[in-house]
Amino acid sequence: MTPGIIVFAHGSRIESANEAVRSVAAELARQGGYPYVEPAFLELGHPDLEGAVLQLAAKGATAILVIPYFLTLGMHLERDLPRIAQEISNKYKDLQITVAPPLDGHPGLVQVLLDRARSFLP
């Protein structure tokens, strides 16, 4: 089993926002030592989830972890992502696709907010 990771974001009409997601995916690969990491977007960015799955499969990944890059649980994570992931799993039965839990409430987010607050407030 060869692992691959997808950083899955909403996507934006503002290309710099999509580039930021691509940078996060690249940094995850670099810091984690994961050779197969791709960004994917629900809408307004490329590739979409299926496109990223196919990119990873072409590199040899057979077990793909989709990490939602959304701050809170909403309809896209509750309804859309599971449906899309299931459709892709049904289409490519030789691939194992797992969706990680959302960032929603992760303690690391509090640290990021504290860092921001401390950089502006005494």
Predicted regions and their residues:
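Active-site-proximal alpha-helix that buttresses catalytic centers in soluble enzyme cores
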Residues: 1-122
